[in-house]
UniProtKB/Swiss-Prot annotation:
The lineage of its organism: Eukaryota, Fungi, Dikarya, Ascomycota, Pezizomycotina. A zinc finger (RING-type) spans 900-945. GO terms for cellular component: cytoplasm; nucleus. ATP binds at residues 519-526. This is DNA repair protein RAD5. Its EC number is 3.6.4.-. The gene is RAD5. Residues 506-716 form the Helicase ATP-binding domain.
Length: 1154
């Protein structure tokens, strides 16, 4: 037997911060010779039946839970001493009931009536008898013989009786919630941190305390001052969950075991509960690490019922890629788990709950366990490879998302129900103020949207919020003593998914009065929403519209009262939030769809923002309030950030967050698919009666994409992420895919209306009759110099990849390899994109001075050339070649259709003139010069034998579409071949555009590229060809964008719109164009298809032809294979585990660099 340790043992409270005792055999008996005098109290605790130490036959708690942490029993114990230990499994026989042994256990004599009640109900089991005595359950059996009463729970009074009958219990009452209120009691195990005799005895009261840890000292770092720890994420040190119990004098004698301390500490720290302990058993001679059993009385504090602050827009935010859990996330998780654990321990059950949440607690704990495991993995990976983490983080955007991705067939299955559109759905006619004619499917959508908005339940009895549970305050404590009651407060309410408590009945607010219009791109979502704005107006708006003439004073109108939150109702106004590039389109579409004077629109952006939106839109200004306020996601985020900086104080705010709009519409709603982004949280906070989300893709590739939309719409109870995670995310990540997908389908079905362009009506007709669309791949051959640049970058990237494969560091160097692949893609567009700009500028200057002596420029107007040569001809020294040159230029101007002297084609293809003014086809001349050069001969003119070179060749350019020319003959210019020749892709594009201009001189086209710098290189080529063009990219202000789109729509004649894929890939209506040129492929063709659908959409009347330029034998060709397999280079796929995802990324890179 081990010797007692002194007070200053290594496990003294001042020397150890871990709530777990040291790893050694615990002493449940003092010494063999002490067994008869020291009662074995580890099995004599007044604990509830749910606790593992003791059990009650009346409760359905598995016996296998008993003493699951007691691993060893004393050897060579006498029959009597062995009977004092609880069995650790059901196989061990239980000692029979014996009065002498029983009284030895409890350390007291009992009366005959108590002994009779215990003996008759313990089933001849000594353990059950001890339990019944200490937890007081024997009393209910005694009461049965005196007066009838409803049975009470064994361990505590936390199970409240049915309140259906009258109570005649004299209890103390008050009218105010006290600082704390008893809720129940439970048993816990602790361990001693001090040695001594008679330190604790049965029945002693101990204090349950948390010692506040001093903040770590700030470290000074030179002149920069102290370095403070980051507040955003949890510190890497071990978490402090130590819970101490002390005597009344304040002397610490022990700590709670870690299992209980984990959640008890959270309840104390969060100021939810206060605990008071009673010693059930402690050895008379206490030694460090001895087991002590306590009964904890728990009281809920008044502060637990306070609400949380404004900044927590979501119930919990997502952890970013490979980052630690934030302090707020950890606090919320521990608060949730602690409340669930507490109610389990005190055997407290709700008297009213939602049927959907009955099994939620198990899932909630499972979700918390998964989060905890993830955090352990993150900390482990942080410790093993910090550089790798930083590398990975740098490659991710600030909106990195969590959650596993869906396979395509799973995504299709999710949409199947939403797309099972009933073509017999009733139709609704738009209001007479609406100026457009809706198609049948659009009228059906209008009926569906109006039904969703008008589905109000104000006449029904208020229902409890589905996330909350109702509990009743106990009437008696664990010792059957009456508890003071609060008048009008017999119940309280708990939300286990958010950790909130309330004394007031949590009424379920009006369910979602809106939805998701998820029609495929090009089916007219904007028009359908505008028809809803016209058709469904509030009563205040209708009254204001009818009375605007009859009443001279707007103060005579019915008003909605102001509330104390500084949020005013805007009953006449619909707020539209859209990407900046779509603001002008919404405004113009609203004007087109409205009859004159029926729709007031307000652009709330930049300099156009109203100084006081609240005064403009409030009910008291109903007659003058705008019907439609259009703003951008950026403005919403900006105002939300300003409001958050004031801790949500709206008293000084008169912008978007100061109003409760009649309706809010977010366009391109996939902008908020990441629930943890600031933009998403800002949109959640906007107040509105009706909420709509417009997107062609409500789920992009993760289930969490849908959650963010559900959160925005306020769909109870799914807008709570803990609830969503419990019933959807956890089953999905645990492999129960069908269960999770079934639940998501039930969420989607009532919320989403989705139609696609390939749907057929019952008559077999397409839903929308669109003109045909042809997509053609144009293979581009790189020139020798371009191929040299490409090969150089390709070999460098391949070498880097091979080296990292050998070293096993591919994922660590993923960003570097990916950047080199990006360089490869840029070199396919134009070599200059990957070169130093200064070097390129020097080369341009040198080339410009090459022919200065001859006075020839790269671009020359033919008229000025003829004038120049005519002037020379008039001189006395009339040289024959100059005279012939003037004559040749006049022939070109007069469109003399001479045949090519080399290939004998008539007329010439891309007519080109030599320095000696002889003409031939451009290709013929270049091939002729190359043939001469290959034979090591000096190239000479095929006609006059003068020396020629590529730099002396000028291509004839006719400006056929020049509407400014008054002359019948178009202007003609010469452009030097070679100097102005751009990359192979630009040359191919210009060839297509020239051919298109000849065939369709009035055609409009859109040129897409993901590289804005490449668009800048296309501009000079268009200028030289005298092709009119406009440009729209992300760097332009909203007004400039609106002007460009308006000019492109209104402009007559051959026009090109240069558009960046990011700025113009979504939302825009470009049906005035008929041709699309995709200059470079994207990883997913879906992104390109989105851009193409800006042209091929409802309103398009002509056939749309799409040309996709792809460089042969390059990374672009291999990207098409990646597209065909529906893969993404930067993301993982489907149900792969982390290792499989890494391997898949490596395989993708191998294919791109093969």
């Amino acid at each position: 037997m081990e010797q007692p340790l002194g007070d200053m043992s290594p496990w003294h409270p001042d020397n150890h911060m871990d709530p777990e005792p040291p790893t050694k055999r615990r002493r449940f008996l003092a010494d063999p010779d002490e067994a008869s005098s020291d009662p074995v109290a580890h099995d004599s605790s007044p604990l509830p039946p749910s606790k593992r130490f003791f059990e009650n036959e009346d409760e359905t708690v598995p016996k296998t839970e008993r003493l699951e942490t007691i691993d060893e029993k004393p050897n060579n114990a006498s029959p009597k001493s062995s009977s004092t230990e609880l069995p650790t499994s059901q196989q061990e026989p239980s000692p029979s009931f014996d009065q002498e042994t029983f009284e030895t256990f409890i350390g007291d004599k009992v009366s005959e009536d108590v002994l009779s009640a215990i003996r008759s109900n313990c089933g001849n089991n000594i353990e059950r008898a001890v339990n019944m005595y200490f937890d007081g359950t024997y009393k209910k059996f005694m009461k049965k013989s005196t007066r009838p009463a409803p049975p009470r729970p064994a361990a505590s009074s936390s199970r409240t009786p049915n309140v259906s009958g009258e109570r005649t219990i004299p209890i103390q009452t008050s009218k105010r919630m006290p600082n704390e209120r008893y809720i129940g009691a439970f048993g816990v195990e602790g361990w001693a941190t001090r040695s001594g005799t008679n330190l604790l005895k049965h029945g002693d009261i101990v204090k349950i305390e948390r010692q506040k840890r001093a903040p770590p000292p700030t470290k000074s770092k030179g002149k920069a001052g102290p370095v403070t720890p980051s507040r955003g994420f949890g510190a890497p040190r071990r978490q402090d969950v130590v819970v101490r119990f002390t005597t009344q004098s304040g002397t610490e004698v022990g700590r709670l075991a870690r299992e209980a301390a984990n959640w008890v500490s959270a309840l104390i720290d969060e100021k939810i509960c206060r605990f008071e302990g009673t010693v059930v058993y402690a050895p008379e001679r206490l030694r460090t690490n001895d087991t002590i059993f306590l009964q904890l009385r728990c009281s809920l504090l008044n502060s637990a019922f306070f609400s949380r602050p404004f900044q927590l827009a979501d119930d919990r935010s997502a952890a970013f890629f490979n980052q630690n859990e934030t302090n707020d996330e950890k606090t919320l998780r521990m608060r949730q788990v602690a409340l669930v654990k507490l109610f389990q321990e005190i055997n407290l059950h709700p008297t009213l709950t939602n049927s959907a949440t009955k099994d939620g607690r198990k899932g909630l704990l499972q979700a918390a366990e998964q989060d905890e495991e993830k955090q352990k993995e993150v900390k482990k990976s942080d410790g093993n490879g910090t550089n790798n983490t930083k590398e990975a983080n740098s490659s991710q955007s600030s909106d990195t998302e969590d959650g596993e991705e869906l396979e395509q067939d799973q995504l299709d299955a999710l949409y199947k129900k939403a797309q099972s559109f009933d073509f017999n759905t009733p139709e609704a006619e738009p209001a007479d103020t609406f100026a457009m004619t809706l198609r049948k499917y659009q009228k059906q959508a209008l009926h569906w949207m109006m039904a969703k908005e008008k589905d109000e339940k104000s006449h029904r009895e208020p229902l409890m919020h589905p996330l909350w549970e109702q509990y009743e305050w106990p009437l008696k404590d664990v010792d059957e003593n009456d508890l003071p009651q609060i008048e009008g407060q017999s119940k309280f309410y708990v939300n286990p998914y958010s950790g909130d408590l309330s004394l007031d009945f949590p009424v379920q607010e009006q369910h979602c009065l809106g939805g998701i219009l998820a029609d495929e791109m090009g089916l007219g979502k904007t028009i359908q929403m505008l028809s809803l704005v016209h058709t469904h107006r509030s009563e205040v708006a209708l009254e204001a519209r009818q009375s605007v003439v009859a009443r001279s004073n707007v103060n005579q109108l019915t008003r909605l009262g102001k509330n104390s939150e500084s949020i005013l109702d805007a009953p006449c106004t619909t707020l539209v939030v859209a990407p900046m590039s779509l603001l002008s389109q919404w405004q113009s579409e609203a004007e087109k769809a409205s009859k004159d004077g029926t729709m007031k629109t307000e652009l709330y952006y930049g300099n156009e923002k109203s100084s006081n939106l609240q005064a403009l839109c409030c009910a008291s200004n109903a007659a003058n309030a705008p019907d439609l306020v259009i703003t951008s996601y950026g403005v919403v985020l900006s105002e939300f950030s300003s409001l958050a900086a004031r801790n949500g104080d709206k008293s000084f705010h008169n912008g978007l967050f100061s109003l409760r709009f009649f309706r809010i519409i977010i366009d391109e709603a996939h902008h908020i698919k990441n629930r943890s982004s600031k933009t998403s949280k800002a949109c959640y906070e906007i107040s509105a009666t009706h909420r709509w989300a417009l997107t062609g893709t409500p789920i992009v590739n993760k289930l969490e994409d849908l959650f963010s939309l559900v959160r925005f719409l306020g769909v109870e109870p799914w807008n709570n992420f803990s609830f969503w995670r419990t019933f959807i995310t956890v089953p999905f990540e645990s492999g129960d895919f069908m269960r999770a997908l079934d639940v998501v389908q039930t969420v989607l079905e009532p919320l989403v209306l989705r139609r696609t362009k390939d749907m057929k009506t019952p008559d077999g007709e397409p839903l929308v009759l669109l003109p045909p669309k042809q997509i053609e791949i144009v293979n581009v051959e790189l020139s020798e110099t371009e191929r040299d640049v490409y090969n150089y970058i390709f070999n460098k990237a391949k070498r880097t990849f091979s080296q990292n494969v050998e070293a096993g560091t591919v994922m660590k160097a993923f960003t570097t390899i990916f950047a080199q692949i990006l360089r490869l893609r840029q070199s396919c567009c134009h070599p200059i994109l990957v070169r130093n700009r200064d070097i390129v500028a020097d080369e341009v200057e040198a080339g410009a001075a090459a022919d200065a002596a001859a006075g020839l420029a790269d671009d020359m107007d033919l008229e000025s050339l003829i004038t120049s040569f005519t002037a020379v001809t008039d001189k006395a020294s009339k040289e024959s070649n100059q005279t012939f040159g003037a004559h040749a230029l006049e022939q070109i101007r007069d469109e003399a259709e001479n045949e090519c002297p080399l290939c004998f084609e008539e007329p010439m293809n891309d007519q080109t003139v030599t320095g000696c003014w002889h003409s031939a086809c451009k290709k013929c001349l270049l091939d002729y010069i190359k043939h001469q050069t290959d034979k090591a001969e000096v190239p000479r003119c095929f006609s006059c034998r003068e020396p020629i070179n590529k730099r002396d060749l000028f291509e004839v350019v006719r400006h056929d579409d020049d509407s400014d020319m008054m002359s019948k003959k178009p202007r003609i210019s010469l452009q030097r071949v070679g100097v102005n020749a751009s990359s192979a892709k630009v040359v191919a594009l210009m060839s297509e555009l020239r051919a298109l201009r000849r065939e369709h001189p009035k055609m409009k086209s859109v040129v897409f590229s993901q590289f804005t710098s490449f668009l800048s290189l296309i501009e000079p080529a268009l200028t030289r060809a005298n092709i009119k063009f406009l440009r729209l990219d992300g760097s332009m202000a909203q007004k400039a964008r609106a002007a460009v789109l308006n000019e492109f729509t209104e402009k007559k004649g051959f026009t090109i719109l240069l558009l960046s894929l990011r700025a113009g890939g979504v939302g825009l209506n470009l049906t005035s164009a008929g041709r699309v040129f995709m200059m470079d492929p994207w990883w997913s063709f879906a992104v390109e298809a989105q851009a193409i659908d800006r042209v091929h959409r409802m309103g398009q009347e002509a056939e749309v032809q799409v040309k996709r330029f792809v460089v042969k034998e390059s990374v672009e060709e291999r990207m098409l294979k990646v597209q065909e397999r529906k893969k993404f280079i930067a993301t993982s796929l489907g149900m792969m585990n982390d290792e499989e995802k890494k391997l898949q990324r490596i395989e993708d890179i191998k294919e791109l660099l093969s």
